Amino acid sequence: MNLHPRRFIRPALGTLCLATLATLQACNGDACFGVDVCFNNNNTQTVALSGTAATGDALASAQVTVSCVTGSATTLTDGGGNYRVTVNAALPCVVTVTSGGTSLHSLAYAGGTFNTTPETELMLVYLAAQLGTNTAALIGNFQGNPRYQQAMNSPNTVQAAQSAVVTSLQQRYSVTLTAPAFLTTSFTVGQPGVDSDLVALAKAGAIDANGMPDPAAVTLLTQAGAAHPL
C-alpha cells in the first residue's frame, strides 16, 4: 500500500485552514461566500443600496427609509434626489422616500441601484394586485409573509411587473418610455432617460401635481396585476 499521499494531505489541509481563517478575518469573523459577500451570524448580509428619488423633479433632502425582512436604515437624499445607504439585512427590502406631500415606494432584492419614483410605486401596485392585496398591506406585512417575500425577492417576478407597468402606461397614455428598466437604471434628474419619461408621464396625466401616481393609473395597474395573479 502506498502511503506517500499522506505527505501532501497535511500541507493541503493546513493551507485550506489558513485560507479559511483569512477569509473569516476579512469578514470580521462572519461567514463569507463568493466575492465580497459577507453573511453575519444572524443570517443577514451587508447590503449597499443607492438610487435616485424623483418625480420628474428631484426629491431633494427627502427622508429615505429602508425596511428589510430583517434590518433597517435611514438617510436623506442630496440635492439631486440621490441616496446611498448600507444596511445589515435579510432581503428583500422596501424603500420609502417622503418629501412634503409625496411618499413613494420601491423595493430591492439585492445590493446595487434601486430607484424610487412614481413608476416604482405603480410597480408595487401591480405586484400587490398579483398577490391579491394592496400596496399598503404588501408594504406593511411583507416582513412576516413568506409569500410576499418570495415574490419581492424574485428578480424575474419584479422585472415582469416592471415590464407590465411600461406596457400599461404606454398603451393608456400614448407615451413612449425610453427607459423600461426604470427600477435599476441609474439616472440624473433633468437628463434623458428615466427622468424624461417621468416628465412625459406627468404631462400625460399619469402623475399628479404632488408627484404621486394619478388614481386612474393606480386603477389601471391594479386591474392589470389582478389579471395576472401569482
Positions of the model-derived regions?
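Sec-dependent bacterial lipoprotein signal peptides
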Residues: M1-C27
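Feature for extracytoplasmic/surface-facing segments of secreted or surface-associated proteins
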Residues: C27-L230
